[in-house]
């Protein structure tokens, strides 16, 4: 966020906020090693809240999964969006 946008009170878009949160989570996991992913339920709830602003979905329509294979971590997010 630049100083000008801070002073003018411009709001960040939800996509950029979500991107920042995911970057923080990934950075935290890399520093913390192989700690369990206890943030996944909270991440799933937040994703449902954000997506629900635009499309009607329920908690069952989204799946968040973290898989670890040696030195590789994959965060998988599956979202079922109803047809219009």
From Swiss-Prot:
InterPro entries the UniProt entry points to: MinE, MinE_sf
Keyword flag Cell cycle: yes
Membrane-traversing stretches: none
A Pfam family per the record: MinE
Keywords for the protein's UniProt record, in alphabetical order: Cell cycle, Cell division
Family: Belongs to the MinE family.
Name listed for the protein in its UniProt record: Cell division topological specificity factor
